[in-house]
Design a protein with these regions (language model features):
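Rossmann-like dinucleotide/phosphate-binding beta-alpha-beta segment
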Residues: 136-167
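Loop/helix-junction capping segments adjacent to catalytic residues or to phosphate/diphosphate-binding pockets
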Residues: 14, 104, 157
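N-terminal glycine-/charge-rich "phosphate-binding" loop or analogous flexible N-terminal tail
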Residues: 1-51, 57
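Phosphate/diphosphate ligand-binding glycine-rich loop within oxidoreductases
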Residues: 49-127, 136
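Short loop/helix-cap segments at secondary-structure boundaries that form the rim of catalytic
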Residues: 18-23, 42-45, 64-66, 83-91, ...
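Phosphate-coordination loops involved in phosphoryl transfer and adenosine-cofactor binding
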Residues: 3, 92, 143-147
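Cytosolic-biased juxtamembrane loops and peripheral soluble domains of multi-pass membrane proteins
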Residues: 130-131
Length: 167
């Protein structure tokens, strides 16, 4: 008996397909849903062992989620699935997410926005565009301040870690 294939439900480019092939080293057949016609799609969805998806509301057509009843795992490649209509999926289908995968870059972005706000970056930049150079309006110093992090998931924890360097 052969293993059920890995089904990639979203569009990926040739470079990423090469990465998938290299990582799997032939351990599983890989089927790309975006390469298939209507009848082939239904058969591939019914027979998939594991499905990699980005957003099933976009990756799958209406009614296709029900075809995943025999799938052993639906792995989302995104960190959060708040926007995914999980109720459309077959009951009992194990779902995994990529939580925390983007924690470091998101935390750095949060820190950059905090610094930009504290230093009035956007306000002063707009003034510079009109020829006004304002060097006298004080901006906030962040050293010793307290940051309030709402949510301590992967992004929140990493943001708190970065903010700690400010005091």
């Amino acid at each position: 008996m052969t293993a059920a294939p890995l089904l990639v439900a979203y569009e990926i480019d040739e470079r990423r397909r090469a990465v998938v092939a290299e990582v799997l080293q032939g351990a599983a057949e890989v089927v790309y849903l975006t390469d298939l016609g209507e009848a082939e799609r239904a058969a591939a969805l019914r027979g998939a062992g594991v499905v990699l998806a980005s957003n099933t509301s976009k990756d799958l057509r209406p009614g296709e989620a029900a075809l995943l009843a025999e799938t052993r795992l639906l792995q989302f490649m995104v960190a959060g699935v708040d926007f995914i209509p999980l109720g459309d999926l077959p009951p009992g289908l194990p779902v995994a997410v990529n939580g925390g995968a983007y924690a470091e870059p998101m935390a750095e972005h949060a820190l950059a926005l905090v610094l930009a706000a504290a230093k009035r970056l956007f306000i002063e930049h707009r003034k510079l565009e009109t020829g006004e150079f304002n060097q006298f309006t004080p901006n906030r110093m962040l050293a010793g301040m307290v940051a309030c992090i709402l949510g301590l998931g992967g992004v929140g924890v990493e943001t708190a870690r970065l903010m700690r360097c400010l005091g």
